[in-house]
């Protein structure tokens, strides 16, 4: 039996809109959007190539998961950076090379999650 607080949390979780940041042609982003649609969750997708992220949003992402999780160190963009740039990832680099950010980035109620797996999303939403 759920108490009133837990019931309230579940209702808020389902009704507050989810924001998904990524690149529209990314297969992992497509899987995440398909998952959300299949579960009838409302979401807003923001392609950060078309709509670069703000400094505040970058800081929210960084504080939510840390740069080690947020930055895609396997990306071609990351490997092309100089050693100095790799050690000093910042907002300016991310706006210059948006594919440095792992995809997708999901934000809801101040919670930040990076990447996608069915298990990860199921645990987050259920």
Question: Which residue ranges define each predicted feature?
Answer:
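Thiol/selenol-based redox catalytic cores and closely related redox-interacting motifs
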Residues: 48-126
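Short, Lys/Arg-enriched N-terminal segments with co-localized hydrophobic residues
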Residues: 1-14
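Short phosphate-binding/catalytic loops that engage adenosine nucleotides
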Residues: 41
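Local sequence-structure signature of Cys/Sec-based thiol-disulfide redox active-site neighborhoods
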Residues: 14-34, 44-48
């Amino acid at each position: 039996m759920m108490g009133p607080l837990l019931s309230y949390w579940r209702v808020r979780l389902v009704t507050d809109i989810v924001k998904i940041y990524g690149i529209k042609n990314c297969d992992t982003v497509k899987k995440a959007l398909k998952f959300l649609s299949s579960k009838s969750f409302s979401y807003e997708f923001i392609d950060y190539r078309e709509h670069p992220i703000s400094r505040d949003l970058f800081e929210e992402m960084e504080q939510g998961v840390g740069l080690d999780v947020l930055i895609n160190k396997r990306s071609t963009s990351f490997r092309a950076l100089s050693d100095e740039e790799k050690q000093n990832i910042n907002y300016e680099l991310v706006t210059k090379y948006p594919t440095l950010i792992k995809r997708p980035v999901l934000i809801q109620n101040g919670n930040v999650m990076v990447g996608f797996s069915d298990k990860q999303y199921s645990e987050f939403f259920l």
